[in-house]
């Protein structure tokens, strides 16, 4: 009889206790976030030697939840924008040092690292190609990297610098070759996994354009003199129109480097956005069929197109730089000057 009475009491009490416990748990879940509530309970109910690891796991879980909730757009911008962190998912991250001198932030960023890497690669490749050419006999053709390097040098020299600058193009050739190979290597490094595109940073493209602008203006003063330079601003018009023509010509001098800056920056940035967007289509739609049939093939196609664009943009920037230098150093008589002017305007209309 006693056993039956005890079993009846337990049968009545246990469901009540379970219901009260479930209600209390539901109330705590509504009042607190899951991670914070569990972390607080762990700290208050377990010894201090166990509380710290539990709290650490709670923070790690919160960080993983935040990453999981990160939107594809945020991930794309994180890949494109410059920062001090190299992300090597799933292996971890490398944080670059923060440097500040006299209140100026001169921290090393991933684009700075890629610029250094591009410079080192250019020095190594050019040195190896030069050493290979020196070892060959006069009748022997270059091979491998030396052959590719020599072909590109001949192309910039004979098909870019010489026709656009004309007489005296040799003194501008070192700058044009440096700009071409630097932009090309930076563009290609941006296509490597875990890499970054330095030419997708408007500060980098602006600096390159400023170099071209300074060389162009200095060459114009040297070739034409102050008088000839000022006469070029008036463009042979009547003095009554100078108030209109001079501001337009001065503005035109600054629109050229601006066009160089935006063209290179926009093209290199747009290509990476398209590639990443195509990859994220499969994640957004949560479909393996879309990934296999649409997302991955189109991303590979755009990636191959970016290889072509890497060469094309290096060529366009170098060609327009040579064109602006040739326009600045052209003799004012002439048919050559007008022809270069027309070609420059046509070049400013390029959208590739």
From Swiss-Prot:
Localization: Cell inner membrane
GO MF annotation terms: proton-transporting ATP synthase activity, rotational mechanism
What Pfam families would the database entry show? ATP-synt_A
Q: List the InterPro entries hit by this protein, alphabetically.
A: ATP_synth_F0_asu, ATP_synth_F0_asu_AS, ATP_synth_F0_asu_bact/mt, F0_ATP_A_sf
Gene3D superfamilies from the UniProt entry:
ATP synthase, F0 complex, subunit A
Signal sequence bounds: 1-26
Residue spans crossing the bilayer: 112-132, 172-192, 195-215, 232-252, 264-284, 289-309, 310-330
Q: How does it sit in the membrane?
A: Multi-pass membrane protein
> Do the record's keywords include Transmembrane?
yes
Per UniProt, the keywords (alphabetical) are: ATP synthesis, Cell inner membrane, Cell membrane, CF(0), Hydrogen ion transport, Ion transport, Membrane, Signal, Transmembrane, Transmembrane helix, Transport
Q: Which CDD domains match?
A: ATP-synt_Fo_a_6
**Listed GO cellular component terms?**
plasma membrane; proton-transporting ATP synthase complex
HAMAP family given in the database record:
ATP_synth_a_bact (MF_01393)
- Subunit structure as annotated in this protein's UniProt entry: F-type ATPases have 2 components, CF(1) - the catalytic core - and CF(0) - the membrane proton channel. CF(1) has five subunits: alpha(3), beta(3), gamma(1), delta(1), epsilon(1). CF(0) has four main subunits: a, b, b' and c.
- Would you identify the family this protein belongs to, as annotated? Belongs to the ATPase A chain family.
Task: State what this protein does.
Answer: Key component of the proton channel; it plays a direct role in the translocation of protons across the membrane.
Name of the protein: ATP synthase subunit a 2
Organism the protein comes from: Chlorobaculum tepidum (strain ATCC 49652 / DSM 12025 / NBRC 103806 / TLS)
